[in-house]
Regions:
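N-terminal low-structure segments adjacent to metalloprotease catalytic domains
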Residues: 1-102
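Active-site recognition of the HExxH zinc-binding catalytic motif
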Residues: 190-202
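Generic preference for flexible, low-structure residues
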Residues: 148, 191-193, 208
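Catalytic or ion-translocation cores adjacent to nucleophile or general acid/base/metal-coordination motifs
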Residues: 202-209
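Auxiliary, metal-adjacent structural segments of Zn-dependent hydrolase domains
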Residues: 100-171, 181-182
Length: 209
């Protein structure tokens, strides 16, 4: 997935150089970083927003997104369990819901979990991962390799439909789970394994082409 992203960014930079105003050093550095190590799911999300911005001829937005990609590509994120809020995700709170809505072809309305929900969710996720580790250390390692972040979110009161879990090709490495559903570690185990399988299938879908 990372190599495919780097290849596509190379193409975007080549065909849109005048509008993107890419510095060669920034391009080379970002592509090298993306190919070399894990990157935030937000890098993938910004890539799609970059393409959407060019399609709409919003060149200022495209330039800003490119600068953000360059900056984020330098970071090597570790596996983490995060709440769906601006303190943890910043502008990705809006981006994640919007891109998930595109893929689901319906509006996904998420909100930050209540404090007590978040505490239970994090404890459940930590316990589930420990149980997987005890049963199959290689599988636990694979989860941590494929998933960058497990994000606990709640369904907004304005949402038309609920959700149990969600992941997206456009946000590779991020798994969103409903904090209201997964406060038991066995349920959490099943959810983590299911959504991790999606991450693997996203990657394999490129290999098979």
């Amino acid at each position: 997935m990372r190599c495919a992203l780097a290849d596509s960014l190379t193409h975007v930079a080549a065909v849109s150089a005048d509008n993107l105003k890419v510095a060669e050093a920034d391009l080379t550095g970002a592509l090298s970083e993306i190919r070399a190590h894990r990157i935030s799911p937000g890098v993938f999300g910004r890539y799609y927003d970059l393409v959407f911005a060019f399609a709409a001829e919003r060149h200022d937005d495209a330039q800003r997104l490119w600068r953000e990609i360059v900056r984020l590509a330098r970071k090597q994120p570790q596996f983490s369990i995060l709440p769906y809020d601006e303190g943890a995700l910043g502008p990705d709170t809006e981006r994640y819901a919007r891109l998930l809505s595109l893929e689901a072809e319906s509006t996904v309305v998420l909100t930050a979990p209540r404090e007590e929900e978040w505490v239970r969710f994090k404890e459940s996720a930590t316990a589930a991962l420990a149980l997987i580790e005890a049963a199959d250390a290689a599988l636990a390692s694979e989860i941590r390799e494929l998933v960058i972040e497990v994000v606990g979110a709640s369904r907004s009161a304005h949402a038309g439909r609920g959700f149990g879990g969600a992941s997206s090709f456009m946000l590779w490495g991020s798994v969103l789970l409903n904090t209201e559903y997964y406060d038991a570690k066995l349920d959490m185990m099943a959810a983590l394994l299911h959504e991790t399988a999606h991450q693997l299938l996203f990657g394999l879908s490129l290999v098979s082409r």
